[in-house]
Swiss-Prot record:
The gene is pufB. It is a single-pass type II membrane protein. It holds the Pfam family LHC. This is Light-harvesting protein B-870 beta chain. Keywords: Antenna complex, Bacteriochlorophyll, Cell inner membrane, Cell membrane, Chlorophyll, Chromophore, Light-harvesting polypeptide, Magnesium, Membrane, Metal-binding, Transmembrane, Transmembrane helix. The core complex is formed by different alpha and beta chains, binding bacteriochlorophyll molecules, and arranged most probably in tetrameric structures disposed around the reaction center. The non-pigmented gamma chains may constitute additional components. One of its GO terms (molecular function) is electron transporter, transferring electrons within the cyclic electron transport pathway of photosynthesis activity. One of its GO terms (biological process) is photosynthesis, light reaction. A bacteriochlorophyll binds at residues 21, 39. Its main location: membrane. The lineage of its organism: Bacteria, Pseudomonadati, Pseudomonadota, Alphaproteobacteria, Rhodobacterales. It is found in: Cell inner membrane. Residues 46-50 are periplasmic.
Length: 50
């Protein structure tokens, strides 16, 4: 187990912080992809410019 000198102000070790960051970024990319698909589908259905 890591000692307290390896912890940042969040209480996570560097490895834990990197893992959390990768999971967060995966979720962000998934959210952005769903948002883009939803906007494209809405634009195809009912264009808002034109």
């Amino acid at each position: 187990m890591a000692d307290n000198t390896d912890l940042s102000f969040t209480g996570l070790t560097d490895e834990q912080a990197q893992e959390l960051h990768s999971v967060y970024m995966s979720g962000l990319f998934l959210f952005a992809a769903v948002a883009v698909v939803a906007h494209l589908a809405t634009y195809i259905w009912r264009p808002w410019f034109g």
